[in-house]
Amino acid sequence: MSITKNDKNTRTTGRPTLNEVARRAGVSPITASRALRGVASVAEELAQKVRDAARELGYVANPAARALASAQSHSVAVLVPSLANLLFIETLEAIHAVLRPQGLEVLIGNFHYSRNEEEDLIRNYLAYQPRGLLLTGFERTESARRMIEASGIPCVYMMDLDSGSGLNCVGFSQLRAGEAAAEHLLARGRRRLAYIGAQLDQRTLLRGEGFRRALQKAGCYDPGLEILTPRPSSVALGGELFVQLLASQPQVDGVFFCNDDLAQGALLEALRRGVKVPEQIAVLGFNDLPGSDCTVPRLSSIRTPREAIGRRAAEQLLALIAGKEVRDSALDMGFELMAREST
């Protein structure tokens, strides 16, 4: 087979082209492109023919070429603070399930709870002109805020609420969730209540503030019953901090952890040391992560709508990309207190 540079429908290198895939599948290059991107308007039978042709030829899409051809990428950038936490994995799965059928690639950035790292990721992603941004919370550097605003790219904020800002956001009130935690423990007759928080991102601090306010209102707040550490949340850390709390405050009768993994660690340590839960001390977690209903005793926790937040945030972003008006810019997904055996 002879190959010439003047024939744009043949390749000039050994790399298969989209045009070759289209010819083999018997469709136009545009249809082939849409099929490979998973656009829902392409019939499944036709899309399968295109995928088969691409596989037979060893074709791999070139995102840079696609972006140059359309003057805009087909991607959405999603930034989360951690991929080690199931909280964000469930949210990302929901986002992908909404965006992928629309032919949008999901670019995931993990900024490890670092504002500077998030700023770098935002700068890098904006250079590729994504169709939209999905960001976690409102806490970031001023430089990052300016870049987002100047880009003009649709953006939706997840996990937190700020109805007064006019920003598009999907989440729940972290402050109110903290208050609900305190109210639950108070209703169980507990008065010596502790709060243990790790990582110390804005959401953790807001939960603690809500917890503190409710205790102050009840007249039983003790600042000596707060343990806060910037260390990453984990089961092992939960056990360690629980032991620290019992050693320094033996009269404590209830504790609220900022995340379930910490609370799960506390339950394991209580079992190891013969501390009776909830008879001696009530233990309450947050997020209701998988496994919390299988601990001994079963962990009480505040369930957060992680899947729903991801899904609705992605849907809101699609509406913004399409130029539609979003009436409820601040969408409160609420939370649910799961009262189990540990309280």
UniProtKB/Swiss-Prot annotation:
Q: Looking at the UniProt feature table, which residue ranges are given for the DNA-binding region?
A: 18-37
The residues forming the signal peptide are none
Q: Give GO terms: molecular function aspect only.
A: DNA-binding transcription factor activity; transcription cis-regulatory region binding
What SUPFAM superfamilies does the annotation carry? Answer: lambda repressor-like DNA-binding domains, Periplasmic binding protein-like I
List the CDD domains hit by this protein, alphabetically: HTH_LacI (cd01392), PBP1_GntR (cd01575)
Where in the numbering of this chain does the HTH lacI-type domain appear?
16-70
Write out the entry's keywords from A to Z.
DNA-binding, Repressor, Transcription, Transcription regulation
InterPro entries in alphabetical order: HTH_LacI (IPR000843), LacI/GalR-like_sensor (IPR046335), Lambda_DNA-bd_dom_sf (IPR010982), Peripla_BP_I (IPR028082)
Give me any GO biological process, just one.
regulation of DNA-templated transcription
The stated induction of this gene product is: Negatively autoregulated.
Instruction: Give the top-rank taxon of the lineage listed in the UniProt record for this protein.
Output: Bacteria
Q: How is its activity regulated?
A: Free GntR fails to recognize gluconate and 6-phosphogluconate, whereas the GntR/DNA complexes recognize both ligands. It is therefore likely that GntR DNA binding induces structural changes that permit GntR to recognize effectors.
Q: What task does this protein carry out?
A: Involved in the regulation of glucose metabolism. Represses its own expression as well as that of the gluconate permease GntP. It employs an effector mediated de-repression mechanism: in the absence of ligand, GntR binds to the gntR and gntP promoters and represses their expression. The release of promoter bound GntR is induced by gluconate and 6-phosphogluconate that bind with similar apparent affinities to the GntR/DNA complex. The release of GntR leads to transcription of the genes.
PANTHER family for the chain? HTH-TYPE TRANSCRIPTIONAL REGULATOR GNTR (PTHR30146:SF2), LACI-RELATED TRANSCRIPTIONAL REPRESSOR (PTHR30146)
Q: What is this protein called?
A: HTH-type transcriptional regulator GntR
Tell me which species this is from.
Pseudomonas aeruginosa (strain ATCC 15692 / DSM 22644 / CIP 104116 / JCM 14847 / LMG 12228 / 1C / PRS 101 / PAO1)
Name the gene: gntR
